[in-house]
Amino acid sequence: MMARIFILALLGQLCFLPYLDAITSSPKVQVYSRHPVDSNKENFVNCFVSGFHPPQITIELSKDGEKIPKVEESDLSFSNDWTFNRLVSAPFDPNSRSEYTCKVTHLTLQEPKVVKWDPENN
């Protein structure tokens, strides 16, 4: 009887192994504009954060070091590997000389990750 319980417990753990990678996973951060910089359309700066687990995360968009108060946040979604994704965006003027950054705080990071929007590599 004890051997059966041991085998069942071992099989249960083996079934769980593929999901261990998702227990903690650091976020990947991309900052880009919704439309090309030279278009005359109303534009948005986007911060797409992907591949993180657990789902608790803080994402802030800033203009010249000041947090942008009104941002749009997508619902939290997840990928096939059970890591999470979120998009945060705000209207902006890409032709201004302002600096836009995205700051991500997550338990897998020793310090927040800050990524600057680069109009040259958009």
From Swiss-Prot:
Belongs to the beta-2-microglobulin family. Residues 1-22 form the signal peptide. This is Beta-2-microglobulin. SUPFAM superfamilies: Immunoglobulin (SSF48726). Keywords: Disulfide bond, Immunity, Immunoglobulin domain, MHC I, Secreted, Signal. The lineage of its organism: Eukaryota, Metazoa, Chordata, Craniata, Vertebrata. Disulfide bonds join 47-102. Component of the class I major histocompatibility complex (MHC). Involved in the presentation of peptide antigens to the immune system. It is found in: Secreted. It comes from Trichosurus vulpecula.
